[in-house]
């Protein structure tokens, strides 16, 4: 994943199997008023692995999602569940970072995410089907 060009390349050895326009982290900073908690929305560079894959993933919204929206952080864990925002498929890279779909396909190619890698529907399905659990993911 090239975070400067916002491109995802699926390779097997030296062979390019698929290229997709993606969106990656903004690099922006969010600070929670009064608590001093801070989040930086960068896509983490380095070598990662696909730890899990899910169809119809449900996002367990972290605290920062509520802080960003100016809403109270829910005490009930079920109030954090969002079955819509991640798209039809997700590949889990660990640390809360995923390759997933987007509700905002017009923003693909821009650095607009909170650190995850977003893909369009067709590209996401192709990557999901072609990438096994355990595959290496290089983010640079």
Q: What role is predicted for each listed range?
A:
Residues 3-4, 20-38, 71-80, 121-122:
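N-terminal post-signal-peptidase region of extra-cytosolic proteins
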Residues 4-6, 13-16, 22-27, 53-55, ...:
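Solvent-exposed coil/turn segments that connect beta secondary-structure elements
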Residues 8, 50, 91:
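Conserved hydrophobic/aromatic pocket- or pore-lining residues that grip, position, or stack substrates
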Residues 12, 19-21, 29-33, 61-62, ...:
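A short, polar/proline- and glycine-enriched secondary-structure boundary/capping micro-motif
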Residues 19-21, 47-49, 136:
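Well-ordered beta-strand positions in beta-sheet-rich domains
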Residues 30-53, 119:
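Short, surface-exposed secondary-structure junctions/capping segments
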Residues 42, 58-140:
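Exported/periplasmic cell-wall-interacting domains
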């Amino acid at each position: 994943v090239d975070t400067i060009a916002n491109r995802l390349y699926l390779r097997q050895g030296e062979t390019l199997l698929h290229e997709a326009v993606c969106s990656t982290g903004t690099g922006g900073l969010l600070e929670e008023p009064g608590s001093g908690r801070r989040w930086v929305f960068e896509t983490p560079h380095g070598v990662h692995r696909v730890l899990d894959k899910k169809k119809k993933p449900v996002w367990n919204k972290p605290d920062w999602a509520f802080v960003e929206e100016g809403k109270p952080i829910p005490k009930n864990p079920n109030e954090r569940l969002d079955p819509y925002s991640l798209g039809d498929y997700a590949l889990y890279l660990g640390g809360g970072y995923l390759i997933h779909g987007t509700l905002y396909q017009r923003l693909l190619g821009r650095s607009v995410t909170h650190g995850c890698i977003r893909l369009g529907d067709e590209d996401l399905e192709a990557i999901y089907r072609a990438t096994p659990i355990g595959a290496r993911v290089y983010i640079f």
